[in-house]
């Protein structure tokens, strides 16, 4: 998994590529925790994510809870396979997905 981060005054955009699983989820969690900065909005661009495990879902849920307190979080460019996981687990109802 690779992570690229772009920051502006309004938002932090984290571009994720690869698999989000038990091996890579801690790196994503660390990036979210350390790189949000003062931004009130977090965008997770998932156009290159082909797979997400329960460990990845846990990271997204934690990020969502954190961002609800200070602003907003949305996921963009979610592929069909990952969207299927979100729908089966109920995360499609919890997360803002565009």
Where are these regions (language model features)?
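Short acidic-hydrophobic, aromatic-tinged amphipathic segments that line or gate anion-handling sites
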Residues: 96-98
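Amphipathic alpha-helical interaction surfaces in cytosolic regulatory modules
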Residues: 22-94
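Short leucine-rich amphipathic alpha-helices used at interfaces
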Residues: 2-3, 34
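STAS-typified acidic loop motif
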Residues: 3-29, 48
């Amino acid at each position: 998994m690779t992570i690229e981060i772009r920051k502006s005054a309004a938002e932090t955009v984290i571009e994720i590529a690869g698999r989000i699983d038990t091996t890579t989820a801690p790196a994503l969690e660390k990036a979210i925790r350390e790189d949000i900065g003062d931004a009130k909005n977090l965008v997770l661009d998932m156009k290159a994510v082909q797979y997400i495990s329960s460990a990845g879902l846990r990271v997204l849920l934690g990020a969502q809870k954190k961002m609800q307190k200070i602003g907003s979080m949305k996921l963009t460019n979610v592929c069909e396979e990952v969207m299927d996981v979100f729908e089966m687990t109920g995360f499609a109802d919890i997360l803002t997905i565009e």
